[in-house]
Amino acid sequence: LIDHAWGYEPCTIKDVKAYKPSVNSLSSGQVLQEPYPFEKARLIVKEMADFLAMDLFEKRLVTNQIVIDIVYDAENLSRPEINYNGEVKEDRYGRKMPAAAHGSHNLGKFTSSTAVLVEEFDKLFRKTANHDLLVRKLNLCASFTLDEKTAAENRAAEQISFFDDASATASEEEKTAKERKRQEAVLEIRKKYGKNAMLKGMNFEQGATGKSRNKQIGGHKE
């Protein structure tokens, strides 16, 4: 405070650039072009989780906590077949719509596994979303991330229980190593030929948006 009172800033640009927050997060959001029913929105969640996992892997980050936010469409209140009678909120434009949903889940371990994150985000969406409502916006977040090296060091420092199943642990590590090789191969192909050079079956299903989003820059088409 005394330094600031005399107009002196002890924190240099070098300090600012060198600063790394102890807790980071990585997220992906999407505004759907039209209201999506539950199953179509579920497809989008799996697509987004897949790309988020690859983003983590590319940055050499891992996460142990995931969060999902779901914004419903105003159309839910005007369609009699939906018959919504829950909490209603207004958006910044004054439009009334069902209250948004929020869910989080602790994974129990740090990971950037595509298989794990797609499965866990899918479970979280099914648990959090109202299956009868139309979805308009989705946001997926890896809310607590560490770099792989730090996470590995922390794991190595943990004392292994005498009762731990060594064979199960070895099998899990082997499975993880195989997936990492697959992720590395996918990453290299996408870097060389573009993100759409290697897609999954779900990216070609009706209502999928991953392929078109890969062609966008900053949310706009190239």
Regions found by a protein language model. Name each.
Residues 1-222:
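Basic, low-complexity intrinsically disordered segments
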